[in-house]
Amino acid sequence: MPVITLPDGSQRHYDHAVSPMDVALDIGPGLAKACIAGRVNGELVDACDLIENDAQLSIITAKDEEGLEIIRHSCAHLLGHAIKQLWPHTKMAIGPVIDNGFYYDVDLDRTLTQEDVEALEKRMHELAEKNYDVIKKKVSWHEARETFANRGESYKVSILDENIAHDDKPGLYFHEEYVDMCRGPHVPNMRFCHHFKLMKTAGAYWRGDSNNKMLQRIYGTAWADKKALNAYLQRLEEAAKRDHRKIGKQLDLYHMQEEAPGMVFWHNDGWTIFRELEVFVRSKLKEYQYQEVKGPFMMDRVLWEKTGHWDNYKDAMFTTSSENREYCIKPMNCPGHVQIFNQGLKSYRDLPLRMAEFGSCHRNEPSGSLHGLMRVRGFTQDDAHIFCTEEQIRDEVNGCIRLVYDMYSTFGFEKIVVKLSTRPEKRIGSDEMWDRAEADLAVALEENNIPFEYQLGEGAFYGPKIEFTLYDCLDRAWQCGTVQLDFSLPSRLSASYVGEDNERKVPVMIHRAILGSMERFIGILTEEFAGFFPTWLAPVQVVIMNITDSQSEYVNELTQKLSNAGIRVKADLRNEKIGFKIREHTLRRVPYMLVCGDKEVESGKVAVRTRRGKDLGSMDVNEVIEKLQQEIRSRSLKQLEE
């Protein structure tokens, strides 16, 4: 007879098997009404699943993260229910949960229009408002296959044939006349699935293979209540205003074009931001004692075969040939850095050796995945590799962690989630090697009192890694930084040093990137600041404007003076009204506008305005220069008088 232990340590004794819903009802009708699922001995189960033995039980509600994920998954099934009613010949493929929502890939003999999506969402609401029960049945593999074969669901049959063992018992979930297959759990009743919205459609190949049929992917978002849904939609609206592609065009930062998909054409102002970011990173490299190097753009395929990249990464690599030799354009910098390390005999006294590069890399990303600066084919990594002894690993990883937090704080990013990615199925190196590498990273994080979670199986094929995900002002996650141990690549490329015992040893290699892709990070910053870059990063920091022609000479003198002081400044001497000039440069997000009239010429001062519309009044020119230099030098996120 099961004894159920609840999270508060209390126990309930039963003389028969019980479900999480039974226990919730036993505790109280309010909890039963809120019960979505249960966690039994750490495993999520449906509210109706029976517990036959002693167990630890937590009741999952919409307030739990798992509860929200279940709601989203059930909304995907609701979408399937609705689309089969509207277009009965639709074939259903897969419908997983994603960040903030769900999607379903469908095979439909018509291209869905916006009107179709609206009709589909309306039908989903009509069905959800019926508050029908979702019925779960565990059936044999053969019964599941027969069920979907009879319904013409060829994609579900394919999943059963290729992904589910014949002795398994798949879970079928019945939404009235509609049936879907899933590991679950799902909501017990559709009253939990009232707060959703369909967002967009896109194309997607079956199983992600371009050789397969193109399906239609329908994206949706779902939340536990109306307030949360509306808040999310408002964040999306704000995100659209901050879209770096839109702002990049408004501020003339860069452009992309069809002749070079995924490659950035940097304009002067955008390249100014890029170079200023490089200056900042270089200052940190000097502070943390890195040396900067530059490797070639492409190397012989033979080298990439030695590293293991060719076997694991060749589909993402661009290749070319010359004089009967095949070359790979580098997708990453690490093999080149090992070649530099290998030049000349190294001693243990030379370690740690910290080698950094602004490496120009190229990856053959699918054209459909390209997205402005966020997903490109040609990008620059703020990449570094540290060669060290095993005894130095902990100190070096600690240094990397400090550098990550040091740099992110400069941009105002405070919420950082850390994950430790462990060995994937497809990997190089021994299990003992992976055990040691994973333990070293975990200990370094623990010593820095940094909370982290494991991502099982998500490491790179050559070593485990720490991933740093920062959250922006809209609470969107951006995975940028990595610190990754590699016990394999140096030995593959014959890297060695002479140890204290005068024997040759293989160094440990630590891969380290903080901003990740410079292009992507500029995209993130553009959206984080909505184009209002902090003064130190702004392409033009000051515009000096005249009111009439009589102040032109004074404006030119001031422009030269500020430029000599290291400030990026422009003069606007156009024969336009001063209000027009101020509005134009405000729209260009120029941090400071200095206005010069006859009064300013006579007094040797300037009238200072910020792009936020704040009038700082008349100020001495030297005082303005001194304050701006301090703001720029300190890389402050705030402007004067803020």
Curated annotation (Swiss-Prot):
Q: What outcome follows a substitution of residue 180 to A?
A: No longer edits mischarged L-seryl-tRNA(Thr), mischarges tRNA(Thr) with L-serine, correct acylation is unaffected
Instruction: Locate the region N-terminal region which includes the editing domain, important for catalytic efficiency, its loss increases mischarging with L-serine, deacylation of incorrectly charged tRNA no longer occurs, partially complements a deletion strain.
Output: 2-241
- Where on this chain does mRNA bind? 246-249, 342-349, 489-503, 547-549, 575-586, 595-600, 609, 615
Q: Which gene encodes it?
A: thrS
Q: Which GO terms describe its cellular component?
A: cytoplasm; cytosol
Q: What broad class of enzyme is this?
A: ligase
All residue ranges annotated as the TGS domain in the record: 1-61
List the residue ranges of the region (tRNA acceptor stem binding): 200-219
What is the free-text note on the cofactor?
Binds 1 zinc ion per subunit. It helps recognize and select the amino acid substrate, and thus has neither a purely catalytic or structural role.
Q: Which organism is it from?
A: Escherichia coli (strain K12)
The UniProt entry, under SMART domains, shows: tRNA_SAD
Q: What is the lineage of its organism?
A: Bacteria, Pseudomonadati, Pseudomonadota, Gammaproteobacteria, Enterobacterales
The identity of this protein, by name, is: Threonine--tRNA ligase
Q: Which GO BP terms apply?
A: negative regulation of translational initiation; regulation of translation; response to antibiotic; threonyl-tRNA aminoacylation; tRNA aminoacylation; tRNA aminoacylation for protein translation
Keyword list (alphabetical) reads:
Acetylation, Aminoacyl-tRNA synthetase, Antibiotic resistance, ATP-binding, Cytoplasm, Ligase, Metal-binding, Nucleotide-binding, Protein biosynthesis, Repressor, RNA-binding, Translation regulation, tRNA-binding, Zinc
Q: What is the effect of changing residue 363 to A?
A: 700-fold decrease in kcat for Thr activation, 1000-fold decrease in kcat of aminoacylation, no change in KM
Q: What is its EC number?
A: 6.1.1.3
Enumerate the residue ranges of region (N1 domain).
1-62
Q: Write out the annotated subcellular location.
A: Cytoplasm
Q: What is known of its domains?
A: The protein structure shows 2 N-terminal domains, the central catalytic and C-terminal domain. The C-terminal domain recognizes the anticodon region of the tRNA while the acceptor arm is sandwiched between the N-terminal domains and the catalytic domain. The N-terminal also contributes to the precise recognition of tRNA(Thr). The editing domain encompasses approximately residues 62-224; when it is removed the protein mischarges tRNA(Thr) with L-serine.
